[in-house]
């Protein structure tokens, strides 16, 4: 079980809302830093370990700087993510660039920054050489095909995913890259998403460590690092058990000692890209109740919508909800909690048991620190909300203002009206 406790009180929420109107995404600096330190401690046995935070999860430079201060790098997948990371001071081996169907501009920018470039396809070897150049160190993304099983259950279906290369293609890519001047190599793979088990990373590590030994033997390539990518999830639901990062790190260490060390590859660095695990629990969407509707069901309408948090509408994903100030009240009312989009799937919760809710109540939607604001959009003319940092000293800082109508119309060149 995972107890879902907001990291702010109703009084704090009202204090922030007096300065920055709801809805807004709020991030907990203290929680972010403490979690980053736990991750680094869990993998401290590996001298080359580095967490590359997935920028796509939460692309905000203020948050990237916090993670940078805690020793993290960044995982980028687009030109603009590279630009944001560069602006934050990330360079060279602090950047992992993993992309697919990659434009030449993106590849060249990653090369110019000295990033570790992770190639998604065999044809990208020639593409890299043509449009950027072949660096000393290159990574290739592996897809084992088939299904990825853990215990008695299938975790995911890599064979149906568009990402990565087969083992034969990996070997061919390494051979071609060595001929073009590459000297060191990385292996990267992502086989399952949001796993809530301590066994996923160790199982994946075993697969990739054995692959590394085979590729080293078959091609002579020096394997510099193995990137376990993301996939370590969080307990969105209270009835789920949270992952134990210390146990996960220890499980990976055992596989490392069992497979790589006997093969003379004990100097291989371990990388991770845990966007969700690093930030999701340390972010929340704070929103105010605007309306109640009593028809065939009971509806609670809030000032946020799916444009602020897409996951429930897009995936049917569960996000826990707390009514601030009513944490100890009985959850004896059944509601659909809805936003104002002209779409019936704009619902943060369906048939959710909550305390009795009144207009003006402040609703705290948990675990939006990753894939929350970043997946926002402007459908229905909705404007993206502000982002706020709750600092370690209890003060708050606006780290992204809310969009305005001027922002929404900024790309039009049609009428002076839009410049108002």
What residue spans do the PLM features occupy?
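Active-site loop/helix belt of alpha/beta enzymes
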Residues: 144-290
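Conserved, mostly hydrophobic/aromatic
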Residues: 32, 56, 78, 110, ...
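Short acidic, glycine/serine/threonine-rich loops at helix termini
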Residues: 64, 86-87, 107-111, 128-131, ...
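Charged (often Lys/Glu-rich) extended helix/loop segments that serve as interaction or gating elements
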Residues: 260, 265-420
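Glycine-rich, aromatic-flanked loop segments that form ligand/cofactor-binding clefts
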Residues: 133-147
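A charged N-terminal "starter" segment
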Residues: 1-117, 122-136, 177-179, 183, ...
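Flexible loop/turn segments at secondary-structure boundaries
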Residues: 59-62, 103, 126, 147-148, ...
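Structured core elements
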Residues: 73-75, 96, 118, 139-141, ...
């Amino acid at each position: 079980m995972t107890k879902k406790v907001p990291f702010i009180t109703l009084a704090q929420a009202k204090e922030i809302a007096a300065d920055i109107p709801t809805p807004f995404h709020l991030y907990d600096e203290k929680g972010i830093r403490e979690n980053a330190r736990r991750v680094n401690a869990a993998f401290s046995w590996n001298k080359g370990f580095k967490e590359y935070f997935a920028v796509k999860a939460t692309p905000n430079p203020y948050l990237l700087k916090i993670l940078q201060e805690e020793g993290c790098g960044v995982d980028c997948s687009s030109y603009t993510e590279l630009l944001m990371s560069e602006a934050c001071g990330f360079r060279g081996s602090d950047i992992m660039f993993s992309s697919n169907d990659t434009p030449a501009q993106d590849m060249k920018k990653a090369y110019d920054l000295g990033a570790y470039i992770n190639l998604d396809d065999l044809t990208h070897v020639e593409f890299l050489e043509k449009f950027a150049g072949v660096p000393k160190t290159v990574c290739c993304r592996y897809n084992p095909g088939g299904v990825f099983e853990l215990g008695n259950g299938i975790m995911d279906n890599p064979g149906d995913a568009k990402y990565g290369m087969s083992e034969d293609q990996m070997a061919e890519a390494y051979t071609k890259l060595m001929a073009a001047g590459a000297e060191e190599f990385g292996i990267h793979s992502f086989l399952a998403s949001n796993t809530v088990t301590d066994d996923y990373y160790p199982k994946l590590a075993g697969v990739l460590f054995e692959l590394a030994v085979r590729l080293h033997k078959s091609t002579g390539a020096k394997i510099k690092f193995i990137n376990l990518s993301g996939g370590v999830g969080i307990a969105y639901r209270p009835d789920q058990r949270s992952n134990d990062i210390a146990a996960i790190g220890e499980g990976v260490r055992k596989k490392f000692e069992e497979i790589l060390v006997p093969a003379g590859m004990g100097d291989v660095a371990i990388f991770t890209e845990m966007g969700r695990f690093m930030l999701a629990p340390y972010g929340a969407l704070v929103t105010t109740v605007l309306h109640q509707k009593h028809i065939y069901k009971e509806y609670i309408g809030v000032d946020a919508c799916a444009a602020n948090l897409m996951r429930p509408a897009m995936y049917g994903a569960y996000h826990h909800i707390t009514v601030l100030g009513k944490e100890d009240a009985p959850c004896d009312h059944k509601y659909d909690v809805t936003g104002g989009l002209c779409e019936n799937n704009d619902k943060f919760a369906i048939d959710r048991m909550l305390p009795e809710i009144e207009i003006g109540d402040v609703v705290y939607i948990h675990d939006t620190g990753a894939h929350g604001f970043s997946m926002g959009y402007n459908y229905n003319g909705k404007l993206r909300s502000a982002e706020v940092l709750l600092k370690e000293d209890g003060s708050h800082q606006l780290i992204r203002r809310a969009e305005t109508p001027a922002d929404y119309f900024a790309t039009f060149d049609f009428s002076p009206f839009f410049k108002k």
